[in-house]
């Protein structure tokens, strides 16, 4: 599968999202604050903020926490964050992109490098792996939104480029600059999406064995547990039989 990755679902099944819930909230709040500070504090007038708020609602972040994050952006004490992308290779040459938002670039660079080194990878330079990914918009719907044909037709009408559907849902892809436009068009036909965000979509994925999957999960867990890291993306997939052993 070229786009949607099953390992995200594996993380859900392992209960990882519950463990990282508070950390996830703080990262989403940071994105909301930065988006609001860079543009208008009204989500309807600020596409990036609208997506950030949508992502927060998707994981049931309380409304007052969202509003507090927006309000923080308008105060003089809002931190200045730098958005830095790191690229490297994990175990067995799997390409990994790490997006960070930090108030201390030296600290973040040192930490990210140490995670790669500790878990069998190596940090590269900017551009060393991103050419193997496409920067696109990803809009997610649950299976109840409709069958594959219905969603495909709606996506084409909305201006999307690609759709992937399976028993777990629908993933609709579009150009990175047209995410809000396509998302709004889809909502008129399919209702509100579960999630809409910019992602790094691998052009190709490598199926990994159990040993590699275990090593990759350790690296990804370490990265995602760092407060400065916002997203981690790899060009791999975990076959169902390997996933079952990971869950065991």
Curated annotation (Swiss-Prot):
It comes from the Bacteria. GO terms for biological process: regulation of DNA-templated transcription. It comes from Cereibacter sphaeroides (strain ATCC 17023 / DSM 158 / JCM 6121 / CCUG 31486 / LMG 2827 / NBRC 12203 / NCIMB 8253 / ATH 2.4.1.). Pfam families: TACO1_YebC_N, Transcrip_reg. Coiled coil: none annotated. This is Probable transcriptional regulatory protein RHOS4_22610. Keywords: Cytoplasm, DNA-binding, Transcription, Transcription regulation. One of its GO terms (cellular component) is cytosol. Residues 1-21 are annotated as: Disordered. It is found in: Cytoplasm. Signal peptide: none annotated. Its main location: cytoplasm. InterPro entries: Integrase-like_N (IPR017856), TACO1_YebC-like_2nd/3rd_dom (IPR048300), TACO1_YebC_N (IPR049083), Transcrip_reg_TACO1-like (IPR002876), Transcrip_reg_TACO1-like_dom3 (IPR026564), YebC-like (IPR029072).
């Amino acid at each position: 599968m070229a786009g949607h990755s099953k390992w995200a679902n594996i993380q859900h099944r392992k209960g990882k999202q519950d463990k990282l819930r508070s950390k996830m909230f703080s990262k989403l709040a940071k994105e909301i604050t930065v988006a609001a500070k860079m543009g208008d504090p009204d989500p309807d007038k600020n596409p990036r903020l609208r997506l950030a708020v949508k992502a927060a609602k998707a994981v049931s972040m309380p409304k007052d926490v969202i509003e507090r994050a927006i309000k923080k952006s308008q105060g003089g004490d809002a931190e200045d964050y730098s958005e830095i992308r790191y690229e490297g290779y994990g175990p067995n040459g799997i390409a990994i992109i790490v997006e960070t938002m930090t108030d201390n670039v030296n600290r973040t660079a040192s930490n990210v490098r140490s995670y790669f080194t500790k878990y069998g990878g190596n940090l590269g330079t900017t551009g060393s792996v991103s050419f193997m990914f496409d920067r696109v918009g990803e809009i997610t719907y649950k299976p109840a939104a409709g069958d594959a044909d219905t969603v495909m037709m709606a996506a084409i009408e909305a201006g999307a480029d690609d759709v992937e559907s399976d028993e777990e849902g629908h993933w609709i892809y579009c150009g990175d600059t047209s995410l809000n436009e396509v998302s709004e068009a889809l909502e008129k036909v399919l209702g509100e999406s579960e999630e809409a965000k910019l992602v790094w979509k691998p052009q190709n994925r490598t199926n990994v064995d159990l040993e590699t999957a275990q090593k990759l999960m350790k690296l990804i867990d370490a990265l995602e547990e760092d407060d400065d890291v916002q997203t981690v993306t790899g060009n791999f997939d975990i076959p169902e039989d390997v996933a079952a052993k990971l869950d065991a």
